[in-house]
């Protein structure tokens, strides 16, 4: 599979693209069993990474548009350390 980038260093878009490639490779049926198992594990980790990035983005958006009562409060700076 070549060099495998660390998940933490991948943007959502990079992780999604890699996940699509993993799925394509698995669906082709051409990978040997051991490689298929490695691909599946990598794909599962990529899926979890993408979900975490989406969850973090959703939390930031909700913090921006709602106050503690759930009413629109305008824009507030979001925490740059999230995600």
UniProtKB/Swiss-Prot annotation:
Q: A cellular component term (GO) from this record? A: exodeoxyribonuclease VII complex
Q: What class of enzyme is it?
A: hydrolase
Q: Which domain of life is it from?
A: Bacteria
Q: What Enzyme Commission number does this protein have? A: 3.1.11.6
User: Keyword Nuclease, does the record have it?
Assistant: yes
- GO-annotated biological processes: DNA catabolic process
Which segment of the chain is annotated as a signal peptide? none
The record's GO molecular-function terms, alphabetically, read: exodeoxyribonuclease VII activity
Q: Which reaction does it catalyse?
A: Exonucleolytic cleavage in either 5'- to 3'- or 3'- to 5'-direction to yield nucleoside 5'-phosphates
Keywords, alphabetical:
Cytoplasm, Exonuclease, Hydrolase, Nuclease
- Subcellular location field: Cytoplasm
Does the record carry Coiled coil as a key word? no
Spell out the coiled coil positions from the record: none
Q: What does this protein do?
A: Bidirectionally degrades single-stranded DNA into large acid-insoluble oligonucleotides, which are then degraded further into small acid-soluble oligonucleotides.
Assembly with partners or alone: Heterooligomer composed of large and small subunits.
Family the UniProt entry places it in: Belongs to the XseB family.
Q: What is this protein called?
A: Exodeoxyribonuclease 7 small subunit
* Organism of this sequence: Novosphingobium aromaticivorans (strain ATCC 700278 / DSM 12444 / CCUG 56034 / CIP 105152 / NBRC 16084 / F199)
Name of the encoding gene: xseB
């Amino acid at each position: 599979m070549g060099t495998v980038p660390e998940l933490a260093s991948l943007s959502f878009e990079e992780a999604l693209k890699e996940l699509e490639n993993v799925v394509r490779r698995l669906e082709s049926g051409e990978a040997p069993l051991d490689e298929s198992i490695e691909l599946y594990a990598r794909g599962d980790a990529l899926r979890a990474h993408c979900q975490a990035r989406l969850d973090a983005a959703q939390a930031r958006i909700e913090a921006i548009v709602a106050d503690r009562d759930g009413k629109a409060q305008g824009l507030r700076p979001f925490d740059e350390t999230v995600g």
